[in-house]
């Protein structure tokens, strides 16, 4: 029997392990089960090359909870350890590495691999015992124990089977881990896809609890998830079934991308494009990161480009650097390469679907558009590829145009005086119907840009697309949507024009009205209310938040009232001798225009209704 003290200055290491090293105490179980899996995989490898003799037996991992004894055991039939290996790996290597690291990076949040996974057990234990026997011929059983101080016990024991049993004596502060339901949930969370079968047994389960007993007889994990298989071996049904395994309540995904790279880095996984409805809250953090099938985290913003955080699925890579608890990503060149690779794979997949099955691509655009537009705003490499498959839907006939197709369809008709192509868009085809029809009457193409990201997308693309200018269909009268400096003659005299402008000089609460009399087509409405493009965009951006959001949100709405002096209604109105009636009719024309923009509310709307009834009486 050997008693001793770990041969480095370790008094400060255990408190750090217990309190600071791991962000979440429940991952102690992941670390210990992962070690058991590693030991099991090693014995399989050694057996296959003839270095481990004898029968392997059933290779499984058992997690056994005994609430009465306040112990949790992790048992494997892996390679095991000799007394020398126990001394080396448990008493020397881990601690010396930890001490060196902690001295150098005491205040840093970047923690490297130092074999401390085993010591995570001390976060929840008053004592840890190890019973182990190496696969080597003539190996003896070994017992090791430690109570969290630098002192340990190490001696030989009789042990029949190869492998390791770790017994955690759960401390008073951690008695939540004596709950069988809690342990099973932790195993399902972290070990769901480990490559060795894991069984969980709760000694407190009653003998007549058939359901619990059946659970104990089944492994908690799927040892062969589809992302470790070759894409050629899988069917669409396999991918859809795996999606349901990950997200039981989720709708069938639109499509998926199977990642399978082994050089210059290792990366496997499956990314799914979910259906997204604009009215539903979008959920991020749905991608799960694994390392050799061990769950690490669902916070993958450093690996997956931000615009793809809306995707669902699994990424598995042993080349992604993690801290000792496998919970925080470190800065690393591989991460950047993986990020770029995922972006390229997504862009290539979208381009492939667009080219090979455009009809299907357009049918999925309601969901895909959000990914594509967000990506174009945030990733220039993705932008270069996406310029070819971004599509915009015509508000009139539902035809989809790429950017170049829209430019061709609009031709010279929608080029302004600066030579830029003017993309006319609607954010609400129903409310803006009159403006859309007026624009279409001039031969213009109006497209729908009505999603939650479009306000930012429009501003962003105008900076990236030199030859394009966006104009909302209700931001000006149809004649002015494309600024060509063309004018229509006015039928009113200068004196009549000034008089008409004066009649529209009333005030409307909460609105700043700018009145202009113009000579438009006689078929154009008598009054058109529009909101200046710049101010409307600022209001849209304010709705999305940001530094100037509060400032623009409190500003009154700026509204341009364009009075069509060529409309026949004014010929009679200007001659009306009843001044009160004339003012009421003028005000009604203005209110109808404001109503079309959704700007007539509250008391102003009530007044309009009462006035309309009075005029009809």
Enumerate the language-model features and the residues they cover:
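GHKL (Bergerat-fold) ATPase N-terminal catalytic module, capturing the glycine-rich phosphate-binding loop
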Residues: 1-177, 185
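GHKL/Bergerat-fold ATPase module in large chromosome/replication-associated machines
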Residues: 110, 128-151, 171-174, 181-617
């Amino acid at each position: 029997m050997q008693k001793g003290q770990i041969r480095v200055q370790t008094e400060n290491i255990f408190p750090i392990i217990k309190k600071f090293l791991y962000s979440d105490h429940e991952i102690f179980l992941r670390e210990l089960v992962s070690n058991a899996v590693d030991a099991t995989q090693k014995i399989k490898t050694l057996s296959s090359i003839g270095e481990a003799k004898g029968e392997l037996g059933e290779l499984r991992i058992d997690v056994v909870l005994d609430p009465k004894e306040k112990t949790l055991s992790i048992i494997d039939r892996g390679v095991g350890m000799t007394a020398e290996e126990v001394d080396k790996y448990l008493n020397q290597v881990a601690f010396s590495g930890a001490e060196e690291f902690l001295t150098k990076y005491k205040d840093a949040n970047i923690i490297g691999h130092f074999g401390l996974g085993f010591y995570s057990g001390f976060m929840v234990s008053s004592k840890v015992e190890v019973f182990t026997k190496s696969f080597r011929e003539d190996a003896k059983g070994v017992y090791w124990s430690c109570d969290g101080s630098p002192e340990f016990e190490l001696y030989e024991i009789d042990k029949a089977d190869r492998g390791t049993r770790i017994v955690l004596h759960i401390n008073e502060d951690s008695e939540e881990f004596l709950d069988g339901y809690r342990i099973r949930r932790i195993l399902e969370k972290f070990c769901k896809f480990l490559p060795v079968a894991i069984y969980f047994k709760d000694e407190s389960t009653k003998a007549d609890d058939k359901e619990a007993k059946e659970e104990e007889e089944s492994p908690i994990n799927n040892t062969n998830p589809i992302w470790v298989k070759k894409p050629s071996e899988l069917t669409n049904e396999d991918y859809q079934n795996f999606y349901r395994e990950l997200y039981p309540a989720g709708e069938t995904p639109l499509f998926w991308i199977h990642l399978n790279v082994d050089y210059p880095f290792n990366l496997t996984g499956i990314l799914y494009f979910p259906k997204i409805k604009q009215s539903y809250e979008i959920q991020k953090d749905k991608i799960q990161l694994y390392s050799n099938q061990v769950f690490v985290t669902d916070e993958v913003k450093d690996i997956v480009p931000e615009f793809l955080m809306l995707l669902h699925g699994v990424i598995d890579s042993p080349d992604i650097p993690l801290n000792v608890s496998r919970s925080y990503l470190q800065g690393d060149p591989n991460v950047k390469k993986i990020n770029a690779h995922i972006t390229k794979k997504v862009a290539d997949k979208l381009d492939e679907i667009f080219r090979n099955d455009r009809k299907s691509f357009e049918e999925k655009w309601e969901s895909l558009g959000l990914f594509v537009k967000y990506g174009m705003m945030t990733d220039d490499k993705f932008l270069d590829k996406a310029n070819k498959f971004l599509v915009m839907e015509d508000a009139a006939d539902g035809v989809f145009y790429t950017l170049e197709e829209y430019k061709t369809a609009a031709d010279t008709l929608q080029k302004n005086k600066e030579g830029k192509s003017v993309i006319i868009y609607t954010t609400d085809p129903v409310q803006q119907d009159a403006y859309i029809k007026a624009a279409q009457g001039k031969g213009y193409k109006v497209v729908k840009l009505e999603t939650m990201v479009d306000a930012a997308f429009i501003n962003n693309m105008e900076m990236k697309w030199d030859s394009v200018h966006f104009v909302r269909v209700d931001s000006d009268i149809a004649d002015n949507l494309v600024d060509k400096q063309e004018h229509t003659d006015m039928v009113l005299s200068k004196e009549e024009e000034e008089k008409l402008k004066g009649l529209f000089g009333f005030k409307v609460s909460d609105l700043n009205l700018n009145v202009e009399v113009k000579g438009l087509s006689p078929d154009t409405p008598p009054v058109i209310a529009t909101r200046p493009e710049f101010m409307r965009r600022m209001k849209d951006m304010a709705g999305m938040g940001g530094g100037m959001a509060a400032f623009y949100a409190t500003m009154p709405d700026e509204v341009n009232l364009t009075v069509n002096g060529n409309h026949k209604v004014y010929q009679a109105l200007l001659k009306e001798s009843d001044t009160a009636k004339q003012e009421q009719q003028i005000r009604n024309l203005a209110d109808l225009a404001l109503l079309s923009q959704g700007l007539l509310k509250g008391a102003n709307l009530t007044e309009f209704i009462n006035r309309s009834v009075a005029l009809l009486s």
